[in-house]
Amino acid sequence: MLVSGRRRLLTVLLQAQKWPFQPSRDMRLVQFRAPHLVGPHLGLETGNGGGVINLNAFDPTLPKTMTQFLEQGEATLSVARRALAAQLPVLPRSEVTFLAPVTRPDKVVCVGMNYVDHCKEQNVPVPKEPIIFSKFASSIVGPYDEVVLPPQSQEVDWEVELAVVIGKKGKHIKATDAMAHVAGFTVAHDVSARDWQMRRNGKQWLLGKTFDTFCPLGPALVTKDSVADPHNLKICCRVNGEVVQSGNTNQMVFKTEDLIAWVSQFVTFYPGDVILTGTPPGVGVFRKPPVFLKKGDEVQCEIEELGVIINKVV
């Protein structure tokens, strides 16, 4: 991102402090880069629009990727808790580049038509079992990275989603045990090429969902103990400042526990795996007439307690 773009983004984030949704100040794990550091590092975001505590400086034995951090479980989380409680130097936000909180996971699991009110806007029945599809991990980008419109599609749409990040390996997980396998939650933008999703490729959704840059995540992995109730969070999307989606995760048909139990019948979950849990109503394709993203648009996806991600469309 150009310096001018980064300054503009910082201004937007500082203005976000006036928005109705305020992220939690509890444990907010991030992956970031800084000019004086070699490669990605792990950190703690200090608050909405705030700076970053360098966890790798606090404890050089910590891994530098979120997946490795999660694989070590309580041992690394306890270090992060100590860092959160200590009075540590904070890197100014203007000096760091936020990466997706998880990069290159083993899998990105997605759920279709998982909001009651989203089903209503399509005039379709509520599913009786989860509708599962996927994105390739190569679609993941950071919370403030650009979304690139592919030349193959003329119908690129927005979708704000609550994303679950897995923290513990498991298969055939019972719903009652599912939250023990969750590390935390983050904001996702499930960018979707509707022509490829709905008409091309035999109407299989994969290609329409998995173009490069079609899965912005962030800004932080908010640990599950920092989120009061993941199934009662305000969720919204803005395009160029206009609210296009506004809902609540209490409208989800299948909750986090149900999704983990269902999907783990088929595949093994690993630390760092991501589950996109579906989108509320208000997507562009079901508007009359339909509305799609164009170059120059700015999309803001926001979830109460988790934060906001901002992506310029290019």
From Swiss-Prot:
GO terms for cellular component: mitochondrion. Its EC number is 5.3.2.2. It is an enzyme of class 5 (isomerase). Mg(2+) binds at E159, E161, D190. Its cofactor is Mg(2+); Mn(2+). Requires a divalent metal cation for activity. One of its GO terms (biological process) is oxaloacetate metabolic process. Residues 1-84 form a transit peptide. Its main location: mitochondrion. It is found in: Mitochondrion. It catalyses: oxaloacetate = enol-oxaloacetate. GO terms for molecular function: metal ion binding; oxaloacetate tautomerase activity. Belongs to the FAH family. Tautomerase that converts enol-oxaloacetate, a strong inhibitor of succinate dehydrogenase, to the physiological keto form of oxaloacetate. It is thereby required to maximize aerobic respiration efficiency by preventing succinate dehydrogenase inhibition. This is Oxaloacetate tautomerase FAHD2A, mitochondrial. The lineage of its organism: Eukaryota, Metazoa, Chordata, Craniata, Vertebrata.
